[in-house]
Amino acid sequence: MIRLLFISHTGNNEPPMAQCIMDHLIQKAGLTDSLSVSAAAFAKEGAPLSKAAQETLSAHGIPYTMKKAFPIAWKTYDDYDFILLMNDKNNPDIFNTMGGDVDEKIHLLSEYAGKEADIPNPHKGGTFEDAYEEEEKACEGLLKKLEAWIR
């Protein structure tokens, strides 16, 4: 089982839409026995998806759950195979909280869409639709890579 962890934008405690998008893509590809998806945040307590995020996902036919993002802890690094950030790969909180990236598990999600940029933050000037589009492209790219390993 390959375990994926999506980490919220810095300063946001709700799970990224990417968690729901990837979960949906995994189910469509029939890979639920091979891949699992979770979400975390740098907050002490996570929050469920915002109403705007729920509406954006619904508009694209993506089911969502009301699960909260869990707070990142030191052991989080060891529990996941891929740790996917929405923004700021050089955020010191990542390394202070998880102790670094010796196994090179931490990546910007956008890398899987062929970009080196942050995913637009819908809580700080970006739109939920912009964030959805970037997250979807990146999740599709990541799934393609993972499928090649699994199959």
Regions found by a protein language model. Give the residues of each.
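Conserved active-site segments centered on acidic
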Residues: 1-79, 144-151
